[in-house]
A protein has these predicted regions:
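An anion/pyrophosphate-binding glycine-rich loop and adjacent beta-alpha core
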Residues: 1-44, 115-118
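Accessory "access/gating" subregions that flank catalytic or transport cores
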Residues: 29-75
Length: 271
């Protein structure tokens, strides 16, 4: 409805969710038992009673599926670094079902990791961390240089403005529906936005104390890289499968059209 130009609200990006038929059919008490907390929160936020008027909603992404590579023991390619729950890729593929997040957190945290971490620790000898190693000094210098570079830009745009613009680009090009045209346009715009970020972002404060604006700027800088690789991956996967819906690959019934002959694999990108 939104894509067809029928959205509601100031930005024309919302739709109505009308419970009147369900209330008429099942009764308000039944709906209240099922959705009472949700309705109460909605009324508190909007000042509108969803039992009486349609709710105004907007579909939005919950998170991006996929994650860090882990082996059978849930250890990443960094020795000793275990990645559990939704942060890794192991228990889900191109789509998710309700409560999968809870399942993965319980399975990894309760059943797997207590055993695998113990086995790993039993084979190593704990020791003092040697911060005199050249790699430590190089990493510290890189982090400090990045902080100083962000603080030195002293531009005119806030970190949030870049974050919002990047989110809009990714949502429109690499959100619920994707197309070759949109993804190529995003892959042209994201590098431009990244250049604008590093030349015009304004980060108040200093790096000598806790600076949440600086912390946020570092995250948004990373988001620029993540957004680009997401769009590259979505463009490269020339099919529809799971939550990856390419509008060019649709059956006559409007369903996702897969291409298992060429894309029955998990993609891995190296940064």
């Amino acid at each position: 409805m939104v894509d067809a130009g029928h959205g509601i609200g100031a930005r024309k990006n919302g739709v109505y969710l009308d419970f009147s038929h369900a209330i008429e059919r099942l009764g308000q008490d039944t709906i209240s038992e099922r959705y009472g907390n949700l309705f109460a929160m909605y009324e508190k936020i909007t000042g509108e009673n969803p039992y009486q008027v349609p709710m105004r909603i907007y579909p939005a992404p919950h998170y991006t599926m996929g994650g860090l590579w882990v082996d059978y023991n849930l250890m990443s390619n960094v020795p000793g670094l275990f990645v559990i729950g939704e942060a890794n890729f192991s228990d889900h593929g191109a789509n998710r079902l309700g409560a999968s997040a809870l399942m993965q957190g319980l399975a990894d945290g309760y059943f797997v990791v207590p055993m695998t971490i113990g086995n790993y620790l039993a084979k190593i000898t704990p020791g003092q961390v040697d911060d005199s190693h050249a790699a430590f000094a190089d990493t510290e210098r890189e982090a400090r240089d990045r902080m100083e570079r962000l603080l030195a830009v002293n531009g005119s745009r806030t970190v949030d403005s870049f974050h919002i613009e990047l989110g809009k680009i990714v949502w429109e090009a690499c959100g619920m529906s994707r197309s070759e045209e949109g993804l190529k346009a995003a892959l042209e715009r994201i590098p431009e936005l990244r250049d604008e970020f590093w030349s015009d972002v304004r980060v108040p404060g200093s790096g000598d104390t806790l600076n949440q604006s600086l912390e946020k700027a570092g995250r948004v800088a990373d988001f620029m890289e993540f957004a680009e690789v997401m769009c590259y991956d979505a463009l490269a996967r020339d099919e529809s499968a799971g939550a990856h819906y390419r509008v060019e690959h649709t059956t006559d019934e409007g369903e996702a059209k897969r291409d298992d002959e060429n894309f029955a694999h998990s993609a891995v990108w190296e940064f």
